[in-house]
Amino acid sequence: MKTGRIVKSISGVYQVDVNGERFNTKPRGLFRKKKFSPVVGDIVEFEVQNINEGYIHQVFERENELKRPPVSNIDTLVIVMSAVEPNFSTQLLDRFLVIAHSYQLNARILVTKKDKTPIEKQFEINELLKIYENIGYETEFIGNDDDRKKIVEAWPAGLIVLSGQSGVGKSTFLNHYRPELNLETNDISKSLNRGKHTTRHVELFERQNGYIADTPGFSALDFDHIDKDEIKDYFLELNRYGETCKFRNCNHIKEPNCNVKHQLEIGNIAQFRYDHYLQLFNEISNRKVRY
């Protein structure tokens, strides 16, 4: 038996990496009976049948798992936003952050296309990123001339997953980092201000201290797994200040003696972050039940 990590999955064949050696594996029938499928990122134990082929016997317990796209055991989720084309959106960024925290993922923020951004807009984005840094996020704002290799190798060890809207430059970023990958990229649609999906599956690529993965771009975000009363926990500063609210289950909307509302009034919480919380709270409160 060998133990390795699934780095690629296409048509039911799972490519497993074992110290740089790749094996094409398939799961045993037991997984189908249990209606359980391995995903990219899984640590698996498999039996070698032929040269570089085998059958998966066991999938070890996952530390975490992103559902869309399916990838597991993520050490850091890098949320990639572009400054322009498509335009930087704190609302979209906050929604990605909520998704990340709902799956217990560590998140950091990468903003691209600085070289295409007017100076005034750069200043505006830098000011917004300072707010996120004060909340506790690591942020970077990069342009075409920035050294991607230096950036990636400075990131934490383990599995890094790039996630974000279509057209923000995830595949372009990886092509600069590893030109031999030659990943397909697309210009964004001028009419829709968003990109086409060029990455169609998740694949892990080796880096100095782990792996890095591109993921298919999102056209819509799914919050079906999140309850309205959980959302406050995924806005980190609301969660932090909410610990001293009068009521333990305070949703920071109309409740008396709410410390979050107090911190908002004195400027310790950004108004746009609180507004995005309210929007998402109302959206999830009013969603229709799916059967």
Swiss-Prot record:
MF terms (GO), sorted A to Z: GTP binding; GTPase activity; metal ion binding; rRNA binding
One cellular component (GO) term of this entry: cytoplasm
Domain CP-type G: 63-221
Compartments where located: Cytoplasm
Pfam families: RsgA_GTPase, RsgA_N
Top-level enzyme category: hydrolase
Cofactors (names): Zn(2+)
Textual note on the cofactor: Binds 1 zinc ion per subunit.
Classification via InterPro entries: G_CP_dom, NA-bd_OB-fold, P-loop_NTPase, Ribosome_biogen_GTPase_RsgA, RsgA_GTPase_dom, RsgA_N
EC number of the protein: 3.6.1.-
Superkingdom to which the source organism belongs: Bacteria
Residues binding Zn(2+), per UniProt: 245, 250, 252, 258
UniProt keyword list: Cytoplasm, GTP-binding, Hydrolase, Metal-binding, Nucleotide-binding, Ribosome biogenesis, RNA-binding, rRNA-binding, Zinc
Binding site for GTP: 112-115, 164-172
Signal peptide: none
GO BP annotations listed: ribosomal small subunit biogenesis
Family: Belongs to the TRAFAC class YlqF/YawG GTPase family. RsgA subfamily.
UniProt cross-references to PANTHER family, sorted A to Z: SMALL RIBOSOMAL SUBUNIT BIOGENESIS GTPASE RSGA (PTHR32120), SMALL RIBOSOMAL SUBUNIT BIOGENESIS GTPASE RSGA 1, MITOCHONDRIAL-RELATED (PTHR32120:SF11)
Function: One of several proteins that assist in the late maturation steps of the functional core of the 30S ribosomal subunit. Helps release RbfA from mature subunits. May play a role in the assembly of ribosomal proteins into the subunit. Circularly permuted GTPase that catalyzes slow GTP hydrolysis, GTPase activity is stimulated by the 30S ribosomal subunit.
Subunit structure: Monomer. Associates with 30S ribosomal subunit, binds 16S rRNA.
Protein name (Swiss-Prot/TrEMBL): Small ribosomal subunit biogenesis GTPase RsgA
Phylogenetic classification of the source organism: Bacteria, Bacillati, Bacillota, Bacilli, Bacillales
Primary gene name: rsgA
